[in-house]
Amino acid sequence: MRNAILIALLRLPLALMLFILVAPAKAGSFTETDKSVRLIVSGIVSYTRWPALSGQPKLCIYASSHYRQALSSEDEHNPLPYSPVIVHSDRDALTARCDALYFGSESPAKQQEIINQYQDQALLLMSEQNPECVIGSAFCLIIEHNQVRFSVNLDALARSGVRVNPDVLMLARNKKHE
């Protein structure tokens, strides 16, 4: 018994050292594109207002997203303005009672199909695979050559039930907000 406790105590510093060495590597392993996506999504959420929400909004991130790790990882230096939830299906998203959806590889038609299930609910909609931004999401990230920008579907935004600061909408017109 005494030997087991002694061995456990000897392993504790090793485990702590390993944690200290690995934790920063994980946090620092994001690419510049990952960081840009996180920054843009965080900015959009920060400047969005829901009619009946107190506290942080719940952002449901589809598991198909290339940037799900960057969008859901906690970072004490750059806290998220939302509570991230990874969802694997439409049912998961409905059950999670999301305030915002971030689509990954879902087609614009599939996005619209999912959105139609949220009747009369204020919902911020963003996607990374909807370059035309004509149907589906209100905010569409455009990722080209490691640069990230976004466009806005004003019709989808008007129907979303959320209010976004006009300065964010102006950024969509400026091609250099990467």
Residue ranges of predicted features:
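Short hydrophobic alpha-helices and adjacent helix-cap/hinge residues
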Residues: 2-8, 25-178
